[in-house]
Structure formats: structure tokens, C-alpha cells
């Protein structure tokens, strides 16, 4: 989908410097990933080691004309009365013909724009979180669903405060299913990701010790991850995991709980047996009362667990 720069200015509540007409198809936070400069909107993000504002002159020289910046970085004269030399080189602060969108926080503006974009779609969206296995579950699900549906998914492991909005922006008019990862490292981070992804189906993978130093307990981390699914219609999880099962009970979640288990025959998917031969695993399962088998091209425990998570959602 394409947005005019005027509409984006309104959606993110920006103050616009410059009046060049433009259409935006691509969002950029890393100058090394530039592909289509004419239709790119660059968000100048700060990190502990870097400042995206420093790359604006270079991107201008490479053809980018639309930028989201922190307030106070540019003046009207930077995008209007500049010499021909400055305009052509992008040096000396000259950004002739550019659109500068000033906001308090470029990161929050990026997230808000992705959230507004997500609002345009009424299709099944699968949100995947957990300490381990998010990317593998997403990719297995993609392999299972893509022969039958047009699927939009997170690139690579794009599951951060920056990666999630960039992923959700990829939703297009042809999308029939979305698969998005969400990763957190400390309490309070999931709220923004939930607002962007707005999953209708949730998948909680295994929990581990990653980022545990930022949480008081494993239960606190589990509850933070489960908050992604506050409004989801269905949540799939491993009921054999005591922490996950306890958190699901405490979460107050009122949608459908789609559990899988190797121990509980009452689970939505009960794994009767797993056979491993050469490089293939065969799952013998009962799913909502119906028996079936599933063949998977891997035999290690972590891959098999991800396979089960993907299968319970795909079925």
C-alpha cells in the first residue's frame, strides 16, 4: 500500500517542514537497507551507539526526500532557500525539496504509523512470542499455510520495538494471513507491540532464561509475554509447561485456549507418540477428538516442539 506524505503527517501527528508532494511505500531505519529512495520514508532513530539524524545528508544525496526527525533538528531554510550546490550535494544542512516531519519521538511515530496501517486489515493475524523458537514457529507456519493463502510474515527475526512496526508495514491488499513475532527484554515493552500487531491468534513458544535478569520471576516474564494476546480469539500453548499453564490460569484470558500436550489426553492436541527415523520425525496425535499423523523433516527436540506449535495452529 502507498500513503501520501500528507496522510502520514496526519497519522503520526507531525509538524511538516517542506511541501513537496510525495508517496511513501517503504519505511527505513537503517541507511544500509535503502532500495527505493523516491518512495522511502526514513525515521531518524537514536540508540545508545548511534543517531539516525547523522545519516540524513547521505540519504538525501542518494535520493531520499522524506524524513521523520526529532523536533528542533531542522529549520525551514534547510529545505527551501539553499544554493544549487548545497541542494545537489546535500551538504551544509541543505535539503532542498525534502519533507521533514518533526515529532517528539521518531520511534513512537514509527510505531504509531504501523498501528494505523494495521487497522486497515481485517485478516487473521498470528502473533508469536516466547523466549525461544519464535522464528522457527513462524517459518514452519509459513511453509504450512503459504500453499493455500497469501501470507505476510516478519522478515528474519524482526521482533523488536523497531522490527515489529517494519514487519506489520508489509501487510498489503493481497494479504490473507499475517505472521508476526514479538520479542521483549523488560517489563512494559509488550504494550506497544500488542497495539501494532493486534493478533487474532496467539502462539506462546517455550520460556527460557533470556533477559531473565530484567524480571523479578519467570511468572512475571510469562505474564508480560501473554499480554500480547489480551484481545486474541485463540491462544495456543504447551500445557505441559507448568509456568505457562499457571500463567494462563492467572491471566484472566477468556478466549479459546488451544493447548498441546504429551501428557494430558484432554488437551486440544494430544501427542500420543513421536517417532524419529533418520532425519524425519512422525507425530501421532489426537486433535480435537480426531487422530492423525504428521511428518516433519527434523528430529531434535527444539525443532519438534516448534513443529507441534505450528501444527496446532495450522490445523
Where does each model-flagged region fall?
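N-terminal leader/targeting and accessory segments in enzymes
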Residues: 1-110, 272, 299-302
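P-loop/Walker A phosphate-binding loop and immediately adjacent motor/lid segment at beta-alpha junctions
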Residues: 2, 251-260
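A generic structural signal for short, well-ordered alpha-helical segments in conserved domains
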Residues: 9, 56, 138-142, 311
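Conserved beta-strand scaffold positions in the cores of enzyme catalytic domains, especially
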Residues: 16, 81, 100-102, 125, ...
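A generic structural signal for residues located within well-ordered alpha-helices
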Residues: 51, 224, 239, 302-309
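Short, polar loop motifs at secondary-structure junctions
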Residues: 68-75, 239-243, 262-263
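Phosphate-binding loop of NTP-binding sites
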Residues: 107-254, 315
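Adenine nucleotide phosphate-binding catalytic loops in nucleotide-utilizing enzymes
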Residues: 218-219, 256-315
Amino acid at each position: 500500500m502507498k500513503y501520501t506524505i500528507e496522510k502520514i503527517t496526519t497519522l503520526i501527528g507531525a509538524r511538516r517542514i517542506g511541501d513537496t508532494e510525495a508517496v511513501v511505500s517503504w519505511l527505513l531505519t537503517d541507511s544500509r537497507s535503502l532500495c527505493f529512495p523516491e518512495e522511502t520514508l526514513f525515521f531518524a532513530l537514536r540508540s545508545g551507539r548511534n543517531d539516525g539524524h547523522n545519516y540524513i545528508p547521505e540519504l538525501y544525496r542518494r535520493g531520499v526526500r522524506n524524513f521523520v526527525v526529532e523536533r528542533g533538528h531542522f529549520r525551514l531554510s534547510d529545505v527551501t532557500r539553499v544554493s544549487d550546490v548545497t541542494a545537489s550535494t546535500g551538504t551544509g544542512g541543505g535539503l532542498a525539496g525534502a519533507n521533514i516531519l518533526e515529532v517528539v519521538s521518531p520511534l513512537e511515530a514509527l510505531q504509531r504509523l504501523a498501528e494505523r496501517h494495521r487497522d486497515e486489515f481485517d485478516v487473521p493475524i498470528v502473533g508469536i512470542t516466547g523466549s525461544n523458537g519464535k522464528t522457527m514457529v513462524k517459518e514452519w507456519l509459513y511453509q504450512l499455510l503459504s500453499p493455500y493463502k497469501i501470507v505476510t510474515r516478519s522478515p528474519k527475526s524482526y521482533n523488536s520495538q523497531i522490527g515489529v512496526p517494519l514487519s506489520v508495514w508489509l501487510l498489503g491488499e493481497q494479504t490473507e494471513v499475517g505472521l508476526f513475532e514479538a520479542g521483549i527484554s523488560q517489563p512494559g515493552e509488550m504494550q506497544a507491540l500488542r497495539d501494532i500487531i493486534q493478533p487474532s491468534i496467539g502462539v506462546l513458544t517455550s520460556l527460557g532464561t533470556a533477559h531473565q535478569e530484567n524480571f523479578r520471576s519467570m511468572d512475571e516474564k510469562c505474564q508480560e509475554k501473554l499480554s500480547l494476546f489480551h484481545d486474541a480469539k485463540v491462544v495456543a500453548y504447551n500445557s505441559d509447561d507448568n509456568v505457562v499453564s499457571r500463567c494462563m490460569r492467572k491471566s484472566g484470558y477468556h478466549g479459546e485456549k488451544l493447548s498441546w500436550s504429551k501428557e494430558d489426553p484432554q488437551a486440544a492436541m494430544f501427542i500420543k507418540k513421536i517417532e524419529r527415523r533418520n532425519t524425519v520425525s512422525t507425530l501421532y496425535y489426537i486433535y480435537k477428538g480426531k487422530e492423525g499423523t504428521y511428518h516433519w523433516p527434523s528430529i531434535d527436540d527444539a525443532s519438534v516442539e516448534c513443529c507441534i506449535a505450528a501444527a496446532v495452529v495450522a490445523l
